[in-house]
Amino acid sequence: FHPQLERIHFIGPREEAAQLEGSKDFAKAFMKRHGIPTAAYRTFTKNELEAAKMYVLSQDGPYVLKADGLAGGKGVVILDNVVDALKELDSMLGEAKFGSASSRVVIEEHLTGPEFSVFVLTDGENYILLPQATDYKRVGEGQTGPNTGGMGAISPVPLVTPDVLGQVHREVIQPTLEGLQAESIPYC
């Protein structure tokens, strides 16, 4: 630690638990192991670039490509055109577009429908629910164009009813906390 930071109190996950945010591949595999709903996916490395291209060619668009690591909010691209998806794979895996963050790329099923974020504070066993938000990631009007690093958000989210929050608790939050405990991953 830097000496000036010694007196600053903060909260956050330990390194292993932080992978849930820092590695899309880790998070997807964790969700799969613990029955947490998530889009179908496959992960590829630079050495598997040709296999990744073959996988994209076997799928219907839109094509969702995600740099495995943190890329400043710009590591996810959704492309309608297969040619553009193949070029983006070359850029991400072949040319390391996002450095080590794109040393692996997750190719994911495209899901449609409303999207919102749920935030919790947890000690790894209990949690406190914070307000939900809907963010606006795309640079253009009507959520078009490339993702930005974060342009804005709206909270509260009208579509998030008590029933929806109950479903999120049962299907996402509780299995995540139980999965962390089952895998002996301390959260804080």
Which residues does each predicted region cover?
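A short alpha-helix-loop-beta-strand transition element characteristic
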Residues: 10-14, 35-42, 61-63, 97-104, ...
